[in-house]
Amino acid sequence: YAAEVTSILLQASPAVRLEAGSGLMDALLRCLAKYRKHTPDDEIEMEYLENIVDSVCMLATTPAGKRAFVECEGVELLVLLQKQPQVCRLLSLKILDYALSPPPPPPSQQPPPQPGGSVDAADTNREPHAIARRYIDNMGLKYLFAILMHRGGPAVKKLHKRYPETDERAVSCIAWLLRLTERGSPPHWRVLAKFVPSAADSLSWKPHVDRIVELNAAWAERVRDADDQFARRANDDDYDDNGAEERYLARMDSGLFALQMADIVVAFVAQEQQPAVRIEQQLRRKGRSMAAVQSELTEYISTRAAGTLGAGSTNAVASADSGLSGILERL
């Protein structure tokens, strides 16, 4: 019950999240550490574990929470949890997604950002960058891409059905790892190398590229269906049209955020010649094109920069998205 109450309080109150000290993060990670070599025995223990994970995620939406997460070696614990091809691997991915997502500008009292949302300026919050580097340095990419590719047999496939958001979280984490590491640096290249052929591995990059394009096309189709449905409703005389905001929310519900994260990964990978050729081929097979990816990313950047429809402060967004804008220009 204590785990459930803690989770409810942290989710319900931004003030509670801001006031929680590093001691709470440490206690939660200690509870989580038990599952490095243990799988929940029943649904009650599973619910307990999910509450612990949710609490860590909520704390990780604040700068202080991210700092405590790094200091308490939370990144290293995540990698250990992801070594287990069971439920802990997928639940720990949720924590990684929240931990990598940079926090919003210092709020009055506002809800936590959606993972992958607005980025705080690098000079005011460096924890997401540190988390990205630590995760890569601790060999976390191996397990992240195993999750992306649904490796692990029938038991893992069953878990993916229980946690259908896993694909979105995996792509979001890859997108943030690419954005939070300096282009051309060893950590950045280690992420990119998963999509690029090398002398040591000339095969595995193709399935990774194909998987990203597959998810990109699937989410694009869902968003397109939402657009079509909204257009039909907007043409109905009895429909109360609330304009662009309602359309935006409908598109988000259908998978716009996931599509944008996949677009970001595609944009980074397409900077390399061989992957770019394969991306173009796979996109065409799915009825997509790089022009569509460019258009969606342009909309993503401009919407956030406008400071509307859920974007953070204009200055923070401009600083954070400058690198992405440069990538977009080179497509």
Predicted regions located by residue number:
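Alpha-helical solenoid repeat architecture
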Residues: 1-14, 30, 47-64, 80, ...
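Long, charge-rich C-terminal accessory regions
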Residues: 148, 153-171, 175-193
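Long C-terminal extensions of eukaryotic subunits of large macromolecular complexes
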Residues: 228-331
